[in-house]
Every structure is written in C-alpha cells, then in structure tokens.
C-alpha cells in the first residue's frame, strides 16, 4: 500500500509538471484567447492563427484534457471546457499562471542552490537571484517592470490574498450593538469593506483612511465633496452618506480620536522585512496612544499569519505554506506566525498605566488572514478581556 501511494505521488508530481509546462505554452501562444467560447475550432486553423505547430498543439490539448482543461470533441477539433474557458476569460488567471511558470518555478528549483549562501536574509541573495542571475531584488524588479508587478499581484490574489477574506472576517463580528458609532478603517486600499458594512449596519459612520501613495485607490467615479467640519476629509456621494475618505500614511498620528472601533490593515509582518515591521510598530503605537485616552475603543488589526500545523483544512494549509515558500524563494522573507504578531504588540511602548493586549483572534475560513482584536488594558488591572466588542 505504501509503495502504491508513493508511486501515485510521484506520478501526480510528473503530471502536474507537464500540465504547468502546457499551460505556459498555451499562454505564450495565445491559444486560450484565440479559441472562441462555446464552439469547436479546427486544430489546423487554430495552429495557423497562433503560429504554432499543429502537431504540438494537438499533443498539448490531449495532455491538458486529462485535467479537464480543453477538449477534443472529435479528431482535428478543439473546444473549451468550463475550466479552460475561465482561464481564457480571466486575464488575472492567465497572468498568475505565467508568473507561476516563468518566475516561481525557476526560483523554486534554485532553492537548494541557496544552501551554499548560508543563513542569509538578504533580499538580493534569494533563489530568485540565482535563477535569473541578477543582483536586483525581486521587489525592485517589480517596481521597474509593470508587467511583472501585475503578474505578481495576480498570483497573490489567486492564492488567497483577497479583500473578500477581510470582509468575510469583519462581517462575523458583532457590529449591531455599536449604534451610531464611528468606525475608522486605516491602511485601506478602497472603500469596498466600508460599503459592505454600511449596507448591513446603516447607522454606523465610517472614516476610510487611504495611505498617501494609494489615495486614488477608492472609487473615483463617486461624487466627492469636502466635509468642512473635518479638514482633509472628502465624502462620498449620497448613496453612501455615512462613509468619508481621508489620506493618512501608516505610522502617523491618528487624527480621529472618538471612534468606537479602529480597523487596521497591516503590511507584511515578515521578520526579514525590517522597514515594514518598523511601520507596523509605529502604527500600533499611534493607536495605543488613542486607546489609552479612549479605553472603551477596540482595535482590530488584520494581517496574514500562518496557521498552526494541522489547525485548518489540509488544502487551506497547503496554500498558506505555498505562499510562505514563494516569499522565501523570491525575497528571502516568510509569512509570519501568531508569535511574530505578539512580538510586535509587545514592542509597543506602554502608554500611561496600560498597554495593548490581544483579546481575541478570528481567522478567515480559507487563507492566511487573521483579525486580531486588541484592547487597552491597565497594567495594574490584569484579567480576562471580552472576546468581542
């Protein structure tokens, strides 16, 4: 039985390698885009249209068909399946697949070659640098190559880095009892989550704080008018009268002092990413200062954190570990664990007679996202904290 299982594992591995090679070939040759949805197409005509070998195209289709990707309804004809049609109609999936084959796979296969470098956290000494014989870090390459950056973002989104996960976690919290309270969302990339919560709880007021470089990330189609009573804030149109937007860079003082809940979307907590961790500590410090004067308020910090081994469904954990290895191979960073977040909280200087403490943790159902519920607690009054608002 063990021999059979090991043989099956190896054969599945070989199959997936060739599937990825075929998907890369289909992506580069534009076959998926040129093949119309809902009807078959001649192999010969499609090969001529895409400028590829008819024989190779036929062989590629017959292999991917074993995974339900493309089909040969009759000899000499090719047709989309629902799976391949989804790839053909979604540029994000195509970008993610090309990134997987063109960047991640070569980098992953150089991981063992980094052994001779010893224990290094330098972003310029990663498996990616060895694979592409470059001293430029992966993140620098993304900054100067828009296509690479687009594909990287597509890969992240298709491996679980979705705003939907944050929204799903936040909607599980008890907002109803807050009445007409103010909710601040800091480090946001859009007003999407505020709009969802506003529809569910129309009495709540929201202030969405976008970081400076991302200040145009919200829906610019909305009609925006200044709110005279709060300088620097613009308000959305009449469809969302309780949502305001302002610009605020992470780490700066929090200008809204009377909110009931502060939602904070944190950047990477990777131990190797020192600048990012420094910003996180400053941001936690800024909100600790607010909570020390408003101890009834709650801080909800969202971050990507690895689940403890075996604590979630195997497929979910597998994708979390895949993202962790991807970071290691491309940047020498890694996804943090809960203990890493606890270390950052402990690095925040105590304010007055108290400090920040984690009262609860909520994990997304299908990925790395965790919402940490933090409260301000006086050092002289330890004890159990409520697990919700």
Curated annotation (Swiss-Prot):
Cellular component, GO annotation: nucleus
Function, in words: Transcriptional coactivator; part of the gene cluster that mediates the biosynthesis of geodin, an intermediate in the biosynthesis of other natural products. With gedR, coregulates the production of geodin.
DNA-binding feature ranges: 43-62
Subcellular localization, as worded in the UniProt entry: Nucleus
Organism: Aspergillus terreus (strain NIH 2624 / FGSC A1156)
Record's protein name: Geodin cluster transcriptional coactivator gedD
Primary localization: nucleus
Alphabetical keyword list: DNA-binding, Nucleus, Transcription, Transcription regulation
PANTHER family xref list: MONODICTYPHENONE CLUSTER TRANSCRIPTIONAL COACTIVATOR MDPA, PUTATIVE (AFU_ORTHOLOGUE AFUA_4G14580)-RELATED
InterPro entries given in the database record: SAM-dependent_MTases_sf, WH-like_DNA-bd_sf, WH_DNA-bd_sf
UniProt GO MF annotations: DNA binding
Keyword Ligase: no
Residue ranges annotated for the HTH iclR-type domain, each copy included: 13-83
Disulfide partners: none
């Amino acid at each position: 039985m063990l021999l059979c299982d090991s043989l099956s594992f190896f054969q599945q591995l070989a199959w997936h390698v060739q599937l990825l090679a075929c998907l890369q070939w289909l992506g580069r040759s534009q076959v998926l885009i040129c093949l119309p949805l809902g009807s078959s197409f001649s192999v010969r005509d499609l090969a001529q249209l895409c400028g590829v070998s008819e024989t190779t195209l036929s062989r590629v289709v017959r292999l991917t068909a074993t995974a339900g990707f493309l089909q040969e309804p009759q000899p000499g004809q090719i047709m989309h399946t629902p799976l391949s049609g989804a790839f053909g109609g979604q540029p994000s999936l195509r970008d993610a697949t090309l990134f997987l084959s063109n960047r991640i796979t070569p980098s992953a296969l150089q991981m063992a070659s980094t052994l001779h470098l010893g224990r290094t956290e330098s972003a310029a000494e990663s498996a990616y640098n060895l694979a592409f014989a470059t001293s430029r870090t992966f993140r620098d390459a993304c900054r100067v190559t828009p296509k690479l950056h687009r594909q990287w973002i597509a890969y992240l989104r298709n491996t679980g880095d979705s705003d939907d996960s944050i929204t799903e976690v936040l909607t599980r919290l008890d907002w109803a009892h807050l009445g007409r309270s103010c909710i601040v969302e800091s480090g946001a990339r859009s007003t999407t989550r505020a709009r969802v919560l506003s529809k569910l709880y129309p009495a709540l007021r929201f202030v969405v704080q976008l970081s400076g470089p991302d200040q145009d990330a919200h829906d610019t189609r909305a009609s925006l008018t200044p709110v005279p009573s709060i300088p620097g804030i613009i308000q959305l149109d009449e469809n969302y009268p309780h949502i305001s937007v302002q610009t605020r860079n992470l780490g700066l003082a929090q200008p809204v002092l009377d909110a009931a809940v502060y939602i904070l979307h944190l950047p990477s907590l990777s131990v190797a990413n020192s600048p990012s961790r420094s910003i996180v500590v400053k941001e936690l410090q800024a909100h600790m200062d607010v909570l020390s004067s408003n101890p009834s308020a709650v801080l909800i910090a969202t971050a990507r954190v690895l689940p403890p081994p075996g604590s979630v469904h195997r497929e979910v954990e597998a994708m979390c570990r895949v993202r962790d290895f991807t970071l290691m191979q491309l940047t020498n960073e890694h996804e943090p664990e809960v203990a890493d977040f606890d270390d950052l909280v402990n690095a925040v200087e105590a304010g007055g007679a108290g400090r920040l403490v984690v009262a609860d943790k909520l994990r997304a159902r299908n990925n790395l996202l965790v919402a940490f519920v933090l409260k301000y607690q006086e050092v002289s009054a330890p004890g159990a904290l409520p697990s919700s608002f």
